[in-house]
């Protein structure tokens, strides 16, 4: 009898799909209490509108009651079991999703702004209002969702991407084309998808979620007024796709690469505008548009940044404006493509002082211009230079020199050959499986050169290993201060949690690495409500054993040293009862 052919193992990419670590696309294996808290800021928009005599309009105080009745958006049984509505732990208007595939519970609190707006009525003042709410609640939540009308959502997403400086958490704008209260609507799926993105992944960007795709907020534009697939990101693929599984394109995710804390910049310059070139445009129209108080414009040109070079009158007005220090940023009218000085008609604009805007959308260009011109500490030349730089991933920058790819690595090739795989997907699966433990091993040794080599080959230094521990977790545990600094400057997130729920800050506290704690705190790391759950008892235990170093570590991390333990006593009372004089002296100094 002929032997049955040996079954070829399923592809490695499929085999590893359920085990890929958090930094490479999947959240880490859940801890015993895997929870996330998301703040939903409701600004208005179609998603929460109702029909009245004049048409669709936002209605206040209706959304929460409606969501409570939707099983996909609120687990009523779990809420009753945990007495969610009567808990002092959660604010009013808090709902909870059913448990996710990753066995994670996402609690979300709805904060309704007043008045609720149709997005056509949005102004920079409203952008500032949203940004201030993000800043006010930043340390209380793991991620943020902003409900917004679709008409100006791309403008708000772009503006917030610049206003949110040193962002380290996920911010997702979403809305719908049809109110969520109607039988057939896109609001339920969009809200659920946005909550899953904000609650399960650390994507430190202002994003926009619509029709199963997560986009970079400053790369999108609304392309369809009547379709659920209303938005497009013409020059950048989606950051994530939500299909049977959620797939994150981590190589595309923008990272701040900074050691500075999150802050918002709300004083945007409103003396900006959009001017679209068209055949026969008059010099008088251009001159009128460029008059004071205008300080900057986005010039929407033909093709790859072209304008008529036989119109001396128009060019003269642009030149005069540039000489008056009006900043002019050149963007293409095309949906896809970039401004390039390939044609003489494009070079002519550069010659009169117009700045090439690359492949920015008009929405991104306008809000970037508004943001840059508001930086009063910068000179005119510095502002022009800033507009040419890629600040938040809003434009494509072609890297100089060839970059080594992990696919070209002999190490990866040998492993791939031994596993008989050759497809791009399988090679990526090999990379995603091997890079995290290699990077973590280098972090344990404090080997910056090894990590730099991994990064230069395209490795993601925010990847977690099989336990969800990132190189920053390891470096913080070992107290390798220069390595922690390098990882932070390479975009490593201080908010990553391993399967046990620990952050790099918690690891640094545990091993008493004071300098690392200070650096992480400077970067914006903080203790969440989850981290502080049993802190009172831990602090009392440290006080009872005379562990001043441990108490100091918690103090630097932001813990309240007056928290009580399980028996109602605080660390000071415990130290008095146990006669720990050094602890008493320390605690009295800090009170």
Model-derived features: where do they sit?
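ATP/NTP phosphate-donor binding region
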Residues: 3, 7-136
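Accessory alpha-helical/coil subdomains and C-terminal extensions
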Residues: 34-35, 41, 63-81, 91-102, ...
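Ankyrin-repeat boundary/"N-cap" motif
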Residues: 431-439, 464-470, 497-503, 530-541, ...
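Conserved ankyrin/ankyrin-like repeat signature
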Residues: 450, 482-483, 515-516, 549-550, ...
